[in-house]
UniProtKB/Swiss-Prot annotation:
It comes from Homo sapiens. It comes from the Eukaryota. Glycans are attached at residues 56, 85, 110, 137, 219, 231. This is Interferon gamma receptor 2. The chain crosses the membrane at residues 248-268. Residues 1-21 form the signal peptide. GO terms for biological process: cell surface receptor signaling pathway; cellular response to virus; cytokine-mediated signaling pathway; defense response to virus; microglial cell activation; positive regulation of glutamate receptor signaling pathway; response to virus; type II interferon-mediated signaling pathway. It is linked to Immunodeficiency 28: A form of Mendelian susceptibility to mycobacterial disease, a rare condition caused by impairment of interferon-gamma mediated immunity. It is characterized by predisposition to illness caused by moderately virulent mycobacterial species, such as Bacillus Calmette-Guerin (BCG) vaccine, environmental non-tuberculous mycobacteria, and by the more virulent Mycobacterium tuberculosis. It is found in: Cell membrane; Cytoplasmic vesicle membrane; Golgi apparatus membrane; Endoplasmic reticulum membrane. Residues 31-129, 142-240 form the Fibronectin type-III domain.
């Protein structure tokens, strides 16, 4: 029994040695793609890698992507399985959500991807990436379509979520608002489940700046993914009724005071410079038309011109009585005087 056992051991060692010394499969001598990475931003699911460069081949290298779920077999990433074609492609990117944001892998599934390069009958070794779950590993962006409506001492904020969640019982968004009076201290209000938030008790007619932030909560694994802040935007609150009334009163009083000052200044100037003002507004004397014509044409008799132009209404005379005395009576009267 011992010689038989010894020969069996020697035979097994020979087989292992032959297998170890055998050259690798020539069909798998293609370099593998380098630095593959999966991008999970909002609803996006994109796999990218660096291209395989070959100096001795003019044919393009193509790539094949496969995926698997927990305890499942490997599937080829094609139209039938995932909705996009990532088989025999020359691109160095596979966008699983290219068809629509709702496409791609289920966000709560455990997904593993692998990738290899191919050139004719040659292919590289598979490059397997670590598994991921979208809700666990996603980068959440800021809320979108932010609209702010100023109110009386308030700001009403409306927006949409970073991406749609099919089943809100397993995962949902809550929101926070970071706001501050311009030049003041920042405050945070939240969390809110609603996509409409009202900031109340703000000072009227003041400028406030704000940023909105989303946070993803996955109930199944009790995971929180804090999102990015939105861009800073500033708005001025409206004045309330009492403030508007005060402004109207102040404007009215200011206008009346200004008009009073202007009226007083004008009256003072009129008194001080009345002679000059009278001189400015006095109508200069004019020569009668008949005399002006006579000066232009001295040969024209002035009296005839006046008689010609005068109207009958202007020919008015007083009655004149001529009393004559005899020469003797006239001397007596003179002596009496």
């Amino acid at each position: 029994m011992r010689p038989t056992l010894l020969w069996s051991l020697l035979l097994l060692l020979g087989v292992f040695a032959a297998a170890a010394a055998a050259p690798p499969d020539p069909l798998s001598q293609l370099p593998a793609p380098q630095h593959p990475k999966i991008r999970l931003y909002n609803a996006e699911q994109v796999l990218s890698w660096e291209p395989v460069a070959l100096s001795n081949s003019t044919r393009p290298v193509v790539y094949q992507v496969q995926f698997k779920y927990t305890d499942s077999k490997w599937f080829t990433a094609d139209i039938m399985s995932i909705g996009v074609n990532c088989t025999q492609i020359t691109a160095t990117e596979c966008d699983f959500t290219a068809a629509s944001p709702s496409a791609g892998f289920p966000m709560d599934f455990n997904v593993t991807l692998r990738l290899r390069a191919e050139l004719g009958a040659l292919h590289s070794a598979w490059v397997t990436m670590p598994w991921f779950q979208h809700y666990r590993n996603v980068t959440v962006g800021p809320p979108e379509n932010i609209e702010v409506t100023p109110g009386e001492g308030s700001l009403i904020i409306r927006f949409s979520s970073p991406f749609d969640i099919a089943d809100t019982s397993t995962a949902f968004f809550c929101y926070y608002v970071h706001y501050w009076e311009k030049g003041g201290i920042q405050q945070v209000k939240g969390p809110f489940r609603s996509n409409s938030i009202s900031l109340d008790n703000l000072k009227p007619s003041r400028v406030y700046c704000l940023q909105v932030q989303a946070q993803l909560l996955w109930n199944k694994s009790n995971i929180f993914r804090v999102g990015h802040l939105s861009n800073i935007s500033c708005y001025e609150t409206m004045a309330d009724a009492s403030t508007e009334l005060q402004q109207v009163i102040l404007i009215s009083v200011g206008t009346f005071s200004l008009l009073s000052v202007l009226a007083g200044a004008c009256f003072f100037l009129v008194l001080k410079y009345r002679g000059l003002i009278k001189y400015w507004f006095h109508t200069p004397p004019s020569i009668p038309l008949q005399i002006e014509e006579y000066l232009k044409d001295p040969t024209q008799p002035i009296l005839e011109a006046l008689d010609k132009d005068s109207s009958p209404k202007d020919d008015v005379w007083d009655s004149v009585s001529i009393i004559s005395f005899p020469e003797k009576e006239q001397e007596d009267v003179l002596q009496t005087l």
